[in-house]
């Protein structure tokens, strides 16, 4: 298990910064963490539920959960789902691919990252 040696919430950039003893460093944006929350609300019960409109979401609180995870609270009220050390490290190492997959899923579903935007598909 890779446990971060440094955890910092950068409020100005809304990123959770994780540093590891081996020199790895990840900066995970709030939106990325929100749409990849391990909660049942996001992951469903075997069928992930696509999150949209989370462009401006912010992390309001970071709390340790025992010696194995973090609990994040977001300003949209979401506060369920524990991000284990292993899951956080996985998000960091796979961030680029996970983000591209998320953007592709949004596009395929006709959804937007922007909560003030609705995507309209014309049937021609």
Where are the regions that the model predicts?
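Motif-centric detector for short Cys/His coordination patterns
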Residues: 1-124
